[in-house]
Amino acid sequence: MTMKRPTRIAMVAGELSGDLLGAGVIRELKQHLTNVEFMGVGGPQMLKEGFHSLIDISELSVMGISDVLRRYPQLYLIRERLLREWTINPPDVFIGIDYPDFNLSVEARLKKQHIKTIHLVSPKVWAWRQKRVHLIKKAVDLVLTLFPFEEAFYRQHGVSAQFIGHPLADLIEINPSCSTLRKKYNYHSDDTILAVLPGSRVGEIKYMGPLFLEVMQRIAVERPHVHFIVPIACQDLYPVFFKQLHAEYGHLKIQIIQGNAREAMAISDVVLTKSGTATLEAMLLKRPMVVAFKWGILTHAIIAPQVKVPYIALPNLLAGKKLIPEFVQEKANVDSITESVLNLLDSSNQNELIKQFTDIHCTLRQNANEKAALSILRILGTSLT
């Protein structure tokens, strides 16, 4: 008897955040598909789920326009290698996880070969470079969005889209507790803690590290009782941050931990972070925060004129109003950031902010992995098992 060939699902995650999303979707799909293969580009979490990565995820890591331009020949060769593989052995569906500039070009080529394409995590077309929506319409059979306003945007432009919620909203409890976590990091219940997250890439640490260190120095002078905890995403970033720290700020008392950014935020009273997923996590953990971000000069010159939204921090975007202070580029200066952090540290009542964070959390809590898997199965035309 001839064995039915396995369902082939190709995926590309270009960053570790996409690796986490991909792992959750793979885990859920395996509940419905007993004979399935996953291949493409993924990180350690996807590999744990049985994913076969043709290329190491680190080879796709870029930060800013200048890095993309410098690495373009390498990225081009990687893309062509993947497309050759999938031309010879076509997958039943391709799922691009975030990483839009790379994945959309792959999706466009595969769709011309009549391969179903899904994009998980909307490119920020609602924020900048809105003309990309026309490329997305041609390249993608379905966009799976993590936020409700994204689904509405795509449908207005005739693109098939579905809001699935955010996996982090499913993972983090509505009313998180951190009392036992404080003991893990040798803090007391009455200690005042500021969690500082300068970024998860070398380029981000390069711009945000010195700025946030200077803010910590100011706060240490004005509020000597405040404790600082800085999670560093991976070992590769340690030399970069330690060089900045010991250049001028070696006297600062900072607890530096590897990974565990969520725990660092959970035990804190206030979070200081660059923009990005960390702002969402801080909101889901119900932590007051200050958000800042700086680009390189070239990246800022290209991107800034195309930005179409009033905010960069996800809590503000999701609320449709300014819930938390945010500072971008020239406004991301030591004086402004320090003042905002001190105001939050001195505030004794954040009940209204926490209520609004909770309302958004409930909206995003949709069992995202299951919704994504069911949408993928519908595209595949596979009956549920």
UniProtKB/Swiss-Prot annotation:
The record's annotation in HAMAP family points to: LpxB
Its GO CC terms are:
membrane
EC code(s) of this entry = 2.4.1.182
Query: Which protein is depicted?
Result: Lipid-A-disaccharide synthase 2
Q: Enumerate the PANTHER family for this protein.
A: LIPID-A-DISACCHARIDE SYNTHASE, LIPID-A-DISACCHARIDE SYNTHASE, MITOCHONDRIAL-RELATED
Q: Outline what the protein does.
A: Condensation of UDP-2,3-diacylglucosamine and 2,3-diacylglucosamine-1-phosphate to form lipid A disaccharide, a precursor of lipid A, a phosphorylated glycolipid that anchors the lipopolysaccharide to the outer membrane of the cell.
Q: Lipid metabolism: is it a keyword of this entry?
A: yes
Extract the GO molecular function terms from the UniProt entry. Answer: lipid-A-disaccharide synthase activity; phospholipid binding
Sorted alphabetically, the keyword list is: Glycosyltransferase, Lipid A biosynthesis, Lipid biosynthesis, Lipid metabolism, Transferase
GO-annotated biological processes: lipid A biosynthetic process
Question: What Pfam families does the database record attribute to this sequence?
Answer: LpxB
| Natural source organism | Legionella pneumophila subsp. pneumophila (strain Philadelphia 1 / ATCC 33152 / DSM 7513)
Top EC group: transferase
Which gene carries the instructions for this protein? lpxB2
Q: Which domain of life is it from?
A: Bacteria
Catalysed transformations (reactions)? a lipid X + a UDP-2-N,3-O-bis[(3R)-3-hydroxyacyl]-alpha-D-glucosamine = a lipid A disaccharide + UDP + H(+)
Q: Which family does the entry's similarity section mention?
A: Belongs to the LpxB family.
- Transmembrane listed as a keyword: no
Q: What is the lineage of its organism?
A: Bacteria, Pseudomonadati, Pseudomonadota, Gammaproteobacteria, Legionellales
Q: In which pathway does it act?
A: Bacterial outer membrane biogenesis; LPS lipid A biosynthesis
